[in-house]
Amino acid sequence: MSAKTEEILESLKSLSLLEASELVKQIEEAFGVSAAASAGVVMAAPGAAGGDADGGAAEEKTEFDVVLESFDAAAKIKVLKVVRNATGLGLGDAKALVESAPKTVKEGIAKADAESLKKEIEEAGGKVTLK
C-alpha cells in the first residue's frame, strides 16, 4: 500500500459514523455512483455461498429495543420484578410500564443483552419482541 493510501486509511479510521455517512454521500455525488448498489452485491455473495440458511446479513443490527408485548395476568408480579431490575425504575413506574404493554422496556441495547432480557421476561411470563 502506498504512503498516500495509508494516510487516507488512517484519516478514515478517525471519522465518526456521522462524518463517514456524510463522506459516502459526497463521494456518491462527486463520482456519480451509488454505495447502496455495490453494498447489495457484496452482501448477496456471502448469502448465496452460505445457502441462505440463516436469513443473511440483513439482520445484523447492533442495537435492539426490547418490547414487552403482553404478559400472563398470573405472572404480572414476576414480570414486574424483571422489568424493574432491568430498567432501574421505581415500583410505580415499572408497574405503569408493564400495565401499558405493548411498551418498550429498554432501547438501543446490545444483541446479547437484549436476548438475555427477552429470555428473563419470557421465563417470568411475558411476551417480548426485539426490534
UniProtKB/Swiss-Prot annotation:
Forms part of the ribosomal stalk which helps the ribosome interact with GTP-bound translation factors. Is thus essential for accurate translation. Keywords: Ribonucleoprotein, Ribosomal protein. One of its GO terms (molecular function) is mRNA binding. Belongs to the bacterial ribosomal protein bL12 family. Homodimer. Part of the ribosomal stalk of the 50S ribosomal subunit. Forms a multimeric L10(L12)X complex, where L10 forms an elongated spine to which 2 to 4 L12 dimers bind in a sequential fashion. Binds GTP-bound translation factors. The gene is rplL. It holds the Pfam family Ribosomal_L12. GO terms for cellular component: cytosolic large ribosomal subunit. It comes from Prochlorococcus marinus (strain MIT 9301). This is Large ribosomal subunit protein bL12. It comes from the Bacteria. The keyword Signal does not apply. One of its GO terms (biological process) is translation.
